[in-house]
Amino acid sequence: MSNIPAELRFAESHEWARLEADGTVTVGISDHAQEALGDVVFVELPEIGKVFAAGDVAGVVESVKAASDIYSPVAGEVVEVNEALGDSPESLNSEPYSAWIFKVKPASAEADLAKLLDAAGYKGAIGE
């Protein structure tokens, strides 16, 4: 059973989003996603300054089993990436909710976040 923090919002494509106090949105992959992927060996991060619409491909997570696209759950500009994933991509397996991938300055955070699933909705979507 996956650990699903109540304070996060989730895309059906298994990314999580957290609205920060400074108005940015932090993005990562869910515990369910990392379990399905297996051991993560590489993360292709988006470029700082890149602008995404909600649902755009923002990067790639590669594991020993497969490569999977990462989608931006909200529209906005990438303002920070987690460079530590270059040296330790496996932290997405061990700490999926603290090992974030990128941060976005959202175009309309409230509207985009409202379209995402809450923890209970995500739990239902993954059959838990």
Swiss-Prot record:
Could you give the cofactor binding note from the entry? Binds 1 lipoyl cofactor covalently.
Query: Where does the Lipoyl-binding domain start and stop, copy by copy?
Result: 24-105
KW Secreted (keyword) present: no
Sorted alphabetically, which PROSITE patterns does this protein's record hold?
A: BIOTINYL_LIPOYL (PS50968), LIPOYL (PS00189)
- What's in the GO CC field? cytosol; glycine cleavage complex
Which Pfam family name is an example for this entry? GCV_H
Question: What is any one GO biological process for this UniProt entry?
Answer: glycine decarboxylation via glycine cleavage system
- Tell me the keywords, alphabetical order: Lipoyl
Per the record, residues carrying N6-lipoyllysine are K65
Nucleotidyltransferase is among the record's keywords: no
- Cofactor needs: (R)-lipoate
Top-level taxon of the source organism? Bacteria
Question: Which CDD domains does the record match to this protein?
Answer: GCS_H
State the family named in the UniProt similarity comment for this chain.
Belongs to the GcvH family.
Which PANTHER family does this entry report, sorted A to Z? GLYCINE CLEAVAGE SYSTEM H PROTEIN, GLYCINE CLEAVAGE SYSTEM H PROTEIN-RELATED
Whom does it interact with, and what assembly results?
A: The glycine cleavage system is composed of four proteins: P, T, L and H.
Q: Tell me, what does this protein do in biology?
A: The glycine cleavage system catalyzes the degradation of glycine. The H protein shuttles the methylamine group of glycine from the P protein to the T protein.
What name does the UniProt record give this protein? Glycine cleavage system H protein 2
Specify the taxonomic lineage. Answer: Bacteria, Pseudomonadati, Pseudomonadota, Gammaproteobacteria, Pseudomonadales
